[in-house]
Regions:
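Ribonuclease/tRNase effector modules and their secretory precursors
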Residues: 1-112
């Protein structure tokens, strides 16, 4: 078995540490079920959707985690232009919205 070498960006470690901890302790990171390459003014990156409804953003080589967040239904649907194949994940993120997880992940630094 080849060891997995993934590192976290300084942004993930410093500015998103509370969010990442919240995800790890609330719903877990999960297994990758879909991926897509995205590009913006900073360049290309890979977005990974997990079976727990988390989006993990990595560098183009999938060696460095840049950030992550709990997806909302629209973000899950963006991975499936032909229609969502994994309805379980869609139901999960809708349940997370009912519980306010998407909002809570962003309030961790504020002490909430």
């Amino acid at each position: 078995m080849t060891p997995l070498h993934i590192r976290f960006s300084s942004h993930a470690l410093n500015e998103r540490a509370d969010r990442i901890t919240y995800i790890a302790t609330t719903i877990g990171f999960g297994e990758v079920i879909a991926r897509k390459v995205v590009e913006d003014k900073r360049g290309k990156a890979v977005r990974l959707l997990t079976d727990t409804g988390v989006i993990i953003v990595t560098d183009i080589h999938e060696e460095c985690i840049l950030t992550m967040w709990i997806a909302n239904p629209t973000q899950v649907k963006d991975f499936y232009p032909e229609g969502v194949r994994n309805q379980a994940v869609l139901r999960l993120v809708k349940k997370y919205m009912e519980k306010g997880y998407q909002d809570k992940q962003n309030k961790q630094k504020k002490g909430n």
